[in-house]
Amino acid sequence: MTNGFNDIGFFGDDLDSWRDNVRAEFPESFAIADRMNRMGMRMIRDIPEGERPLSQGLALAGFYRALQSFQSAILLAERGALAEARALVRLCCEAVILVGGLLKVEGTVEKLNEDHEKHVLSMANSMIELNRQAKTGADLTPFESEVARVKAEYPEEQKPASLKWASMAAQAGLGRLFELSYRLPSGDGAHVTLSALHRHFDKDKEGEIVGMIFHPDKSDLQSTMLAANASLIHALGLVQEFMDLGQYEAEIRDLLLQWSVTRKELEHE
């Protein structure tokens, strides 16, 4: 049984050569990505242990999530699954915005809890409605109790609200990052939009559709890596500043110098 791309798609073991070629074609993008990833993993080990305010504990978890999403995005990007990589870049950016909010914007813990309670309320109401429609006879008391609890905490005129990512990004000084690494990937990667679907259309020089395609893609890998790297460099800076990692200050400054050069090269390619 063969295990190439034509047999099992992006699970194929013949994508190693594709990955090597992509990394050779875009060395600057992957060089700084690899450097930042190693720095992030070292930071995880070097962050001092001990009690922290809840906001910092949540921010640390957010950093873990951002780094994991970054690593996952790079794995997919180098294998040519760009739409999925861009979805993970957006998720990485979302985590970075939350980290920034938790560390720099008062009231973010409460907003995060409110967002959670909105989800709990929606899920409980959905389970009640689904069971009633299906006449399952299931005990709905746990769901009804959750609804009552949330409504008691948030009266009718003050229902729990979802997090507003654009607003939080602006408050945390991450407005430009939001546009680059959250809004743009949302349009052609994170959601099944018209732009995302057009990735599977083969077009001629005039832009006319001539067939369907399903294969590794590197068409906008440069912008994908730009958005991913921008997200992580902000995350590293926040963690270094707020998590007692003074020993990384010089390394962060040097990283920013490399990023200033790499970013300009990527933006003009």
State each model region's role.
Residues 1-269:
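A cross-kingdom marker of C-terminal helix-rich interaction/assembly modules
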